[in-house]
Swiss-Prot record:
Residues 219-232 have a biased composition (Polar residues). Keywords: Capsid protein, Helical capsid protein, Ribonucleoprotein, Virion. InterPro entries: Pltvir_coat. Residues 1-16 have a biased composition (Pro residues). It is found in: Virion. Residues 1-41, 219-242 are annotated as: Disordered. This is Coat protein. GO terms for cellular component: helical viral capsid; ribonucleoprotein complex.
Amino acid sequence: MGDQPRPPVPPAPGSNPLPMGSTPPVLPGRTPNPNANVANQVGDPFRVLTPEELAAPISAASNKVATREQILGIVADLNALGFVGDPALGLFDLAFHCYDIGSSPSAQPVGPSPFGCSRMQVAAVVRNHCTLRQLCMFYAPSVWNKAVRDNRPPGNWSNLQFTPETKFAAFDFFDGVLNPASQEVPLWRQPTPQEIYASATHKDVATYRAASKAHDRISNSTLLTKGASRSTPPALLPGPDA
């Protein structure tokens, strides 16, 4: 067989294979910026920002809260399906319903929606863009305001072992009330430290109970668990006769 052409040898690390003044190749899938000047755009990443730069506003963001873009996408899909209504009222209605039933992936909303369909249909569209809890987190301040103003605690606050003093914190997106990425509305009243502690405690208990379902214990009492949580059985060394 004849000699086959050999592929070009890659340049050694640290070398400069391009002639001075030439344009480096564009990587696949990248779009060159015609306005870029590599020599002048390097900048100093270690410089101290000016007072004006520090004063520039930056919107709060949280991966636990639905973004405005996601919410606009939800409304667009609802309208495309023929579910037309006041979007603020319709989505708030779903969030306040979840105030009672929870916003977990297993939540099954019931009843009609202001969009002219069922709440379950609205929830299905929501879940194409974000989790139900992320949407509820966004509307949590408004949910809190209505609940406190109407003296209307979540329906299952007693079953969740909340006290009368902390009952208004007995919903699973309570964190959204004070999250800066949530809807910006003045609060009817601030959550009390007791309500904040009760919500955090309940979350820890719920997390432990979920993990303990894989245990072989018949009780979650700390007398048995010593506060430890294990989702898989411990690895044991073989016995002397093994």
